Amino acid sequence: MEAFRTHTGIGVPLRRSNVDTDQIIPAVYLKRVTRTGFEDGLFAAWRNDPSFVLNLPPFDRGSVLVAGPDFGTGSSREHAVWALMDYGFRVVISSRFADIFRGNAGKAGLLAAEVNQNDVELIWKLIEQNPGLEITVNLQDRNIIAGTVMVPFTIDDYTAWRLLEGLDDIGLTLRKQSEIEDYERRRPSWKPRTLPV
C-alpha cells in the first residue's frame, strides 16, 4: 500500500447524506475476485443522470470527495472503498462515517477525514463558488486546506499511523515475518504447520 502524507486534488461536492455502500457500488458490480476494476460501478445508478456531479467537468477529475453525514453506511463492502479508489479518490471528507466503512478505508489506503458538519458546508460552498478548487489534505498535521480556509479533521491514531507508513494488513504481517518463521521452526512436528514458500 502506498504511504499517505498529503494529497492535493480537485474537490467534488456530493451533497447527499446517508450514502450507503449499495449506492456507492451496487451489488451487481461485485462479481470480481480482484481488488481492481470497480470504477465503472461507482455511484452507478446516480451516474445515469447527466447532471450528477461526477458527470460534470471539472468534478469528473476529482480526487477529494466531500460528502454529507453518514457516509458508507450499510453492509461491510470493501468494494465500496475499492471503487472510490479505482475512480481516483484518495480522500473522502464527511462529518460522520459508518465504522465499518472507516475501517475498510484505512486498511485500503483511502483517507476518511472526519470534520464538523459546518466545515463540510463551508467546503461545499467554496467548491461550488470555484469549480476545480484544489483541496490539500495533510495527514501529518491533520488539516484540510481549501482556498484560504484551513479546517482540522479527526482520524484515530492507529489508522493514521498505518496510512502514514503505508501498511495494509499484509504489510503489518510482513513486519513480523522473522518472528513468524522462528515460531514455525519451534513448533512441535506433530502440530499443523505452514509450508515454506
From Swiss-Prot:
Family stated for the protein in its record? Belongs to the LeuD family. LeuD type 1 subfamily.
Q: How does it assemble?
A: Heterodimer of LeuC and LeuD.
Q: Which reaction does it catalyse?
A: (2R,3S)-3-isopropylmalate = (2S)-2-isopropylmalate
Does the keyword Amino-acid biosynthesis belong to this entry?
Answer: yes
Which Enzyme Commission number(s) are listed?
A: 4.2.1.33
Identify one Gene Ontology CC term for this UniProt entry.
3-isopropylmalate dehydratase complex
Q: What is this protein called?
A: 3-isopropylmalate dehydratase small subunit
**What gene is this protein a product of?**
leuD
